[in-house]
Amino acid sequence: MINPIAFQIGPFAIRWYAICILSGLILAVYLARKEAPRKKIKPDDIIDFILIAFPLAIVGARLYYVAFEWSYYSKQPFIEIFITWHGGLAIYGGLITGALVLYFFSRSKFINTLDFLDIAAPGVMIAQSIGRWGNFINQEAYGAAVKSLNYLPDFIRQQMYIDGAYRQPTFLYESTWNLLGFILILFLRRKPKFLKQGDITAFYLIWYGCGRMIIEGMRTDSLYFMGLRVSQWLSALLIILGVVLVIYQHRKKDTPYYYTSLETEKKNA
């Protein structure tokens, strides 16, 4: 089994989970800063946004998890709510918080919210792909017991042997799904005559929503509300929002193309 602690710095334990999250964050920031000028967004605005959004997203991810596991946390010492290294960060809580921060931040900077979402979506997708490996090392976000995992490398099989049985590596399914989504976004961005403002955001919503809805049904650690898997309902909502956004943006006569600002700059140069 892989030790969840990567190394120690004095009394502080640096966990693989944190390394995975930070690695995804750094890559997401790099990608967004690289794309920002094409949307006439200052790269420094990306840094300013992350400094606000990232800590709040962690808080949101934790509060979301605690809220839906209140039957457990209500019986624990209050300090347990703040001990995130025991597990319990829900990605949907982080996404919702991050989206709210992005909306208000973009308005305060007079940036079109869809433009900001479009440049953020690819980085979020790949960051989620990397972050799932933190779940792997923590032995969480897995599925039901299976007879064998012989089709996987030894290190994954060994880590997925939990409570006396091999488990469906749902973390791997979602990580792979998000990686494919990221690659497809890069391909879509090469189609300037087709892509419109908001299309990348819509693709993210639909792609992630579809994958998460299916994979969530395989997991054994889902959060429930009134007997229903919360993440599946939210996934369905993402899909609906994505479809509505595509239809709305493509029916609007004045919706700019994704690269309109870039092409205009080239013509005026």
From Swiss-Prot:
It comes from Streptococcus gordonii (strain Challis / ATCC 35105 / BCRC 15272 / CH1 / DL1 / V288). It is a multi-pass membrane protein. Catalyzes the transfer of the diacylglyceryl group from phosphatidylglycerol to the sulfhydryl group of the N-terminal cysteine of a prolipoprotein, the first step in the formation of mature lipoproteins. The keyword DNA-binding does not apply. It is an enzyme of class 2 (transferase). It comes from the Bacteria. One of its GO terms (biological process) is lipoprotein biosynthetic process. One of its GO terms (cellular component) is plasma membrane. The keyword Cytoplasm does not apply. This is Phosphatidylglycerol--prolipoprotein diacylglyceryl transferase. PANTHER family: PHOSPHATIDYLGLYCEROL--PROLIPOPROTEIN DIACYLGLYCERYL TRANSFERASE, PROLIPOPROTEIN DIACYLGLYCERYL TRANSFERASE. GO terms for molecular function: phosphatidylglycerol-prolipoprotein diacylglyceryl transferase activity. Pathway: Protein modification; lipoprotein biosynthesis (diacylglyceryl transfer). The chain crosses the membrane at residues 9-29, 46-66, 81-101, 110-130, 168-188, 198-218, 227-247. It is found in: Cell membrane. InterPro entries: Lgt (IPR001640). A 1,2-diacyl-sn-glycero-3-phospho-(1'-sn-glycerol) binds at R132. It holds the Pfam family LGT. HAMAP family: Lgt (MF_01147). Keywords: Cell membrane, Membrane, Transferase, Transmembrane, Transmembrane helix. The gene is lgt. Belongs to the Lgt family.
